[in-house]
Amino acid sequence: MSVYNPNDADFAFTLGIEEEYQIVDPETRELRSYITQILEPGRTILREQIKPEMHQSIVEVGTRPCRTISEARAEIVRLRSAIAGLAARHNLRIVAAGTHPFSSWMQQEITPDERYHMVVGEMQDAALQLLIFGMHCHIGMPNNEVAIELMNVARYICPHLLALSTSSPFWMGRNTGFKSYRSVIFSTFPRTGIPPTFHSASEFERYVQLLVNTGCIDNGKKIWWDLRPHPFFGTLEFRVCDIATKVEECLALAATMQALIVKFYTMFEENTTFRVYRRALINENKWRAQRWGLDGKLIDFGKRKEVEAKALVHEIVELVDDVVDMLGSRREVEYLLKIVENGTSADRQLRVFAETNDLKAVVDNLMVETMEGVPAMAFEADVQSQAAHS
């Protein structure tokens, strides 16, 4: 069983987290196109862990590969603190939410990079309006065949994870009626959504090669499914989630993804696994998740009936109960139950707006929640540590 123990050398199921933050002016609460000014000093401190995105009002960070959720916690706290500190040098703040409540994509500057301008040239307004912010979680894989087997099974759980992560109810100053409007916006891109199934890694590789040969893509990174085998990292990458506003929400989601993959792998090894469902059926649940979040019902296709999304979260926690202690993530996984009780970021944003009728108040609350659990002095300590080792 050493393959399941994070403390053993052959543990395969590492995790890494990527987050995309908004750069916000605390006076106007609007997005600010300022990544260029943040990037240079940021790379001095964070090196390859900070990246630009297509819009200059977005900054992306990524953790190092972590064996445990405790390691990931330290990384996320450090990264949020560092980016917040870099932004504060320019009197700016960061926000973790899937969309900005009112800033317009038509007023955002594009990062001066040939790659991004090529994307805009090809995708036009679909690219320009991609002012959205997600959380991606990479789970290490023993090999490519296992990655495909686990992707086929884990597709089913993507709508549940989306419902738990919703943080984008507003778009262009309007309540969209969706808990995750980010996922609606992203659906305008090709090769997005729930992935199809593949019988083997070689079948998947032939699919990618066909797209390359026919000029659709230049490599597998332009396959943007909600769950994909990463073409370079050797991971299975969950891409379905809105960015989590609170650190605890981020860690709960990441820990759950790792635990689910380990659970599915144990079932795979024991020759017992979940039924693999059609993409068309899973898409029904995804639409419900992005529309209603945890307040809606998802379809249990095994039982052929609707079930409250909140009840299904309890089932997820029960499903992974026998692996979380080994992974050291019981506290983080059980935080899902607090999300069920208190609501997601989208729910809180809607409550603030209902109380204030002011989208700026929504941004104010997001700025506070983004830094919840991040020590105020962590950034300066990190700067000093990096300087001492540079």
From Swiss-Prot:
GO biological process, alphabetically ordered: modified amino acid biosynthetic process
Pfam families, per the entry: GCS2
The organism's place on the tree of life at top rank: Bacteria
InterPro entries: GCL_type2/YbdK_subfam (IPR050141), GCS2 (IPR006336), Gln_synth/guanido_kin_cat_dom (IPR014746), YbdK (IPR011793)
SUPFAM superfamilies found in the cross-reference section: Glutamine synthetase/guanido kinase
Chemical reaction(s) catalysed: L-cysteine + L-glutamate + ATP = gamma-L-glutamyl-L-cysteine + ADP + phosphate + H(+)
Enzyme Commission code(s) on record: 6.3.2.2
One GO MF term: glutamate-cysteine ligase activity
Top EC class of this enzyme: ligase
Keywords annotated in UniProt: ATP-binding, Ligase, Nucleotide-binding
Entry similarity comment: Belongs to the glutamate--cysteine ligase type 2 family. YbdK subfamily.
Role: ATP-dependent carboxylate-amine ligase which exhibits weak glutamate--cysteine ligase activity.
HAMAP family referenced in this protein's UniProt entry, alphabetically: Glu_cys_ligase_2 (MF_01609)
PANTHER family per UniProt: GLUTAMATE--CYSTEINE LIGASE 2-RELATED
Name this polypeptide is given: Putative glutamate--cysteine ligase 2
